[in-house]
Design a protein with these regions (language model features):
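Mid/C-terminal beta-alpha module of Rossmann-like enzyme folds, strongest
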Residues: 63-121, 147, 158
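Active-site helix of classical SDR
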Residues: 4
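C-terminal amphipathic/interface module of NAD(P)-dependent oxidoreductases
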Residues: 115-166
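Active-site His/Glu-centered metal-binding helix of metallohydrolases
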Residues: 7
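Short, amphipathic alpha-helical "lid/cap" segments that border enzyme active or binding sites
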Residues: 38, 57-65, 136, 140-147
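Short glycine/proline-enriched coil/turn segments at helix->beta-strand junctions
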Residues: 13-18, 42-46, 69-73, 95-99, ...
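NAD(P)-dependent short-chain dehydrogenase/reductase
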Residues: 10-59
Length: 166
């Protein structure tokens, strides 16, 4: 993936009229969506507690449309400002949606032993996105407003669940 991303970015930099968004760990308010980051980590047997930049689609997709209409160009780290750890996300899920939910942690070293490919953990620069849309919420506030509050109202829950051991 990162090799392809780099190649595409090298090609696109030659064009002046391109607007490219880099999403990271996309989250939407459909907690039963298998492509949703929350669904994924809630169904892992164990999670690594590391902070990352993330994209709350319900908030940011309208800004993508706005950016196109405003004819913005360039590459944007299309993530909510700040970073949040996996444990913080799961704690919000537990607090708002599933009080009996539990999870286990393991270390990066333990994770590396079971993964086919290494994972990257990043807090991406948010200066450019905050300049274009200063009203964008930080990641935690966005998760609460666009994902957890609506699911608290509707009773939304992740389907499935981790069954194994770390």
């Amino acid at each position: 993936y990162s090799h392809t991303k780099g190649m595409v970015e090298d090609l696109l930099k030659n064009y002046e009229n391109i607007l490219q968004f880099r999403l990271r760990m996309p989250i939407d308010n459909q907690l039963d969506n298998p492509r949703n980051f929350i669904f994924k980590i809630a169904n892992y047997d164990c999670v690594v507690d590391v902070p990352n930049s993330m994209t709350v689609l319900d908030e940011l997709v309208p800004y993508a449309i706005d950016g196109a209409l405003r004819k913005l160009t360039g590459i944007y780290n299309f993530t909510n400002p700040g970073a949040i750890s996996h444990n913080e996300v799961l704690q919000l899920y537990k607090d708002y949606c599933s009080p009996n939910y539990t999870w286990k942690n393991f270390s990066l070293e333990e994770q590396d032993k079971i993964l086919a490919a290494p994972r990257s953990n990043n807090e991406l620069c948010d200066k450019k996105i905050k300049s274009a849309w200063p009203q964008i919420l930080n990641i935690k506030d966005s998760l609460i407003k666009y994902v957890f509050e609506p699911n608290k109202q509707s009773g939304g829950k992740v389907r499935g669940g981790a069954k194994g051991e770390c």
